[in-house]
């Protein structure tokens, strides 16, 4: 099948096969056909989000060496970037959250390292929730959790979570594919919306691996999917593998959008860039505090972007902005029509396996 036939399938609302996704991923990032893929992804993203992009903002409640062995992460003890543990006070956490709320972030994310005590995370979260407006969307970015803990997150006032099955999970990490998937499904069972991503993409990942991960993220109807490249942590073993270009990342962002059902409104990329936005990304993150892609303890002094900078990148890419609580994490008002559309997509996806 040629590229135009695949794009015509997308325009008709048909589910792309894994072979279709591999075909699109196999194009040279700078060839004319890839720019056609960008245009189609941009069209879909603007259609499902009414042309309005979102900026979410994340702060870390702690910084500590972690034993989960994620080779791409600056928190990993094996990488030796950070050697001491630090934790925000309740007041500092509330201040960060209010800062993001005041700057107009569409969702406020609380992140912890994977082994941070869950009950302590909840204690901080409850103070943060009390300090925010009721309508502010609060999201958790935590390690794998049981269904019981997922319910506690929901009860504490979280609308959703960010959670991903990472590329080569269990090879480049000490975690298992099964534990990551179980957490995703437990979060959903608890009533939390789940945002995810195809990440962290490196030069070594094959088009078949990427297509399989795109299909997996589509399979559970996330709040958003998307793609993010691996950022090299200086001095680490995995940094020797190199990094993909922003253009290649934008290509993967675009193909991921084409692989999602249109019930998925969001299409993310990280780190924020105009190429990603042109290729259909409608979600960026601002960050403060610890950041798993940064060697600075305060990423606002390193790689982290601000809410305003993220907005400017979108505007430079001809996106309008959404003001108000995140639509990606608050899909309930459209649940009935979404369920019907999702059922059709899911059935088509299963029939192609």
Language-model region placement:
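Helix C-cap/helix->beta junction micro-motif
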Residues: 48, 132-134, 190, 220, ...
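Alpha-helix N-cap and loop-to-helix initiation/capping positions
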Residues: 88, 92, 120, 175-179, ...
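N-terminal [4Fe-4S]-dependent radical SAM core
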Residues: 20-71, 75-84
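Core AdoMet radical
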Residues: 61, 77-184, 193-200, 223-226
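Catalytic cores of alpha/beta
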Residues: 146-153, 203-217, 270-279
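Generic structural signal for hydrophobic
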Residues: 100, 128, 153, 184-187, ...
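Conserved C-terminal portion of the radical SAM core fold
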Residues: 160, 176-238, 253-267
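Auxiliary Fe-S-binding modules of radical SAM enzymes
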Residues: 1-29, 218-353
């Amino acid at each position: 099948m040629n590229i135009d036939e695949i794009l015509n399938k997308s325009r008709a609302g048909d589910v792309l096969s894994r072979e279709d996704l591999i075909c699109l991923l196999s194009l040279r990032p700078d060839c004319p056909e890839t720019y056609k893929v960008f245009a189609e992804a941009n069209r879909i993203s603007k259609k499902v989000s009414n042309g309005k992009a979102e900026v979410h903002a994340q702060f870390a409640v702690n910084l500590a060496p972690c034993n989960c062995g994620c080779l791409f992460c600056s928190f990993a003890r094996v990488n030796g970037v950070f050697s001491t543990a630090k934790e925000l006070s309740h007041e500092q956490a509330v201040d960060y959250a209010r800062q993001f709320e005041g700057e107009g972030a569409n969702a406020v994310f609380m992140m912890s390292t994977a082994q941070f005590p869950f009950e302590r995370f909840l204690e901080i979260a409850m103070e943060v929730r009390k300090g925010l407006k009721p309508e502010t969307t609060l999201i958790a970015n935590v390690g794998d959790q049981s269904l019981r803990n997922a319910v506690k997150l929901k009860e504490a006032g979280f609308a959703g979570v960010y959670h991903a099955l990472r590329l080569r999970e269990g090879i480049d990490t000490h975690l298992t594919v099964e534990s990551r998937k179980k957490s995703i499904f437990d979060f959903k069972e608890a009533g939390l919306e789940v945002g995810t991503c195809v990440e962290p993409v490196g030069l070594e990942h094959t088009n078949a691996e990427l297509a399989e991960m795109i299909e997996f993220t589509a399979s559970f109807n996330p709040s958003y999917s998307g793609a993010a490249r691996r950022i090299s942590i200086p001095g680490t073993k995995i940094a020797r593998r190199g990094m993909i270009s922003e253009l290649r990342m934008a290509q993967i962002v675009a193909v991921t959008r084409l692989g999602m059902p249109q019930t998925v409104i969001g299409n993310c990329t990280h780190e924020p860039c105009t190429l990603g936005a042109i290729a259909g990304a409608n979600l960026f993150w601002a960050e403060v505090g610890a950041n798993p892609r940064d060697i600075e303890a305060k990423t606002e002094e390193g790689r982290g972007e601000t809410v305003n900078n993220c907005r400017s990148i979108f505007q430079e890419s001809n996106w309008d902005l959404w003001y108000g609580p995140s639509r990606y994490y608050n899909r309930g008002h459209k649940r009935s029509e979404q369920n019907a559309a999702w059922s059709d997509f899911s059935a088509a996806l299963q029939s192609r396996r």
